[in-house]
Design a protein with these regions (language model features):
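Extended alpha-helical scaffolding regions
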Residues: 270-320
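Generic structural motif
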Residues: 208, 257-259, 288, 315
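Extracytoplasmic low-complexity repetitive segments enriched in small/polar residues
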Residues: 2-27, 31-33, 244, 248-249
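Extracytoplasmic/surface-exposed domains of secreted proteins
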Residues: 21-27, 36-155, 159-165, 181-235, ...
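Active-site-proximal structural scaffolding
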Residues: 194, 245-247, 303
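Extended, polar beta-sheet/loop recognition surfaces of beta-rich domains
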Residues: 210-280
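Solvent-exposed beta-strand/loop surfaces of large extracellular or lumenal domains
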Residues: 172-178
Length: 320
């Protein structure tokens, strides 16, 4: 009977399919933008007629005013959890393995990094407001600028996950898994912040481009906005301070528990110099009984050390 093949988890810093997959394999700069959309040249042939070269435009972040909630397959922690470990990162998972980069209007940079068009932000409920505004397509989060992560690092907090190793093929290709086993693929965003113990948080899925922010808030988008594709917010020296309003595609809330997980307990440990007798219990065999000879009180070998389960590197038991 053949042994079962163990599952193998493969992680990709980004993933694209279809026309965008071909775009990512091309060298050079990103294709031009028209009204904030990627312009891709394709060749069409209809019913055997002569081929026609045309340019197509893909949807961009400025076209998105909502997502299908069924795309979200899991959140960590679950909504309304009250004792989430503060040393863990919140996360959100999507059914499509390419979802975080689906509407990114660019290709990967020279370092093979691709920024997602969405990110997961986690902000403290105290000092933040999540509200529904009439005649606006999405809920609005208002919070302090200091609560938000650095979007220059958003590429590092997104990845795709592929599970392989349980198919008839010993080394299935990525294309095979995407086509034949979509249930083994997903994408994930992590919330880039360190959580505090016993604190309530909002976890919100928001756009990373300013055109996406304006589209979600129902604000007008100018031609300069579409061509510039500025980030939805900025961090670092010279960045604006104060509050920022962001449209929210998906959100939930949770609370962290008290500090008391393994990490916090391990951090409380303090190294101390221990004596060489740690882990030993003296055992007197000078009067064993049962007719065996009795040893004088000071005779060598009359006192032995019985070792325990724990000992230090310096523990030095008496020889038997």
């Amino acid at each position: 009977m053949p042994e079962p093949t163990a599952a193998s988890y493969r992680f990709f810093s980004w993933l694209r399919q279809g026309l965008l997959a071909g775009l990512s394999n091309q060298a050079g700069a990103s294709p031009p933008l028209t009204n904030g959309h990627l312009v891709l040249p394709i060749r069409l042939r209809v019913n055997g007629a002569a081929p026609v070269d045309v340019n197509i435009q893909r949807y961009g972040p400025g076209d998105i005013t909502g997502i299908d909630a069924r795309e979200v397959i899991r959140t960590e922690p679950q909504a309304h959890m009250t004792d989430f470990e503060p040393n863990y990162f919140p996360a959100i998972e999507f059914d499509r393995p390419d979802f975080p980069w689906l509407f990114t209007p660019a290709k990967a940079d020279a370092a093979r990094r691709l920024h997602p068009w969405i990110c997961l932000i986690v902000v403290r409920k105290e000092g933040a407001a999540l509200s529904t505004v009439p005649r606006q397509p999405l809920p609005v989060l208002t919070c302090g600028q200091e609560e938000l992560p650095d979007l220059d690092q958003s590429w590092a907090w997104a990845h795709a996950q592929i599970v392989s190793g349980q198919t008839a093929s010993p080394n299935p290709t990525l294309q095979q898994i995407l086509k034949d086993h979509p249930d083994r693929t997903l994408s994930r965003l992590l919330g880039a912040r360190r959580l505090d113990p016993n604190t309530a948080y909002y976890a919100c899925l928001v756009p990373t481009y300013d055109v996406g922010r304006k589209a979600g808030l129902g604000e007008p988008i100018t031609a300069d906005d579409e061509q510039g594709l500025k980030p939805a917010w900025s961090q670092g020296p010279g960045a604006p301070t104060g509050t920022v309003s962001l449209p929210v595609y998906f959100h939930w809330e949770f609370r962290t528990g008290l500090a008391g997980d393994f990490e916090s307990l391990a951090r409380r440990l303090e190294p101390k110099q221990l004596p060489t007798t740690v882990g030993l219990r003296p055992m007197d065999i000078g009067q064993p009984g049962w007719g065996m000879p009795v040893l004088p009180p000071d005779a060598p070998g009359g006192l032995l050390d019985l070792g325990g389960a724990l000992r230090t590197p310096e523990t030095n038991p008496r020889p038997w």
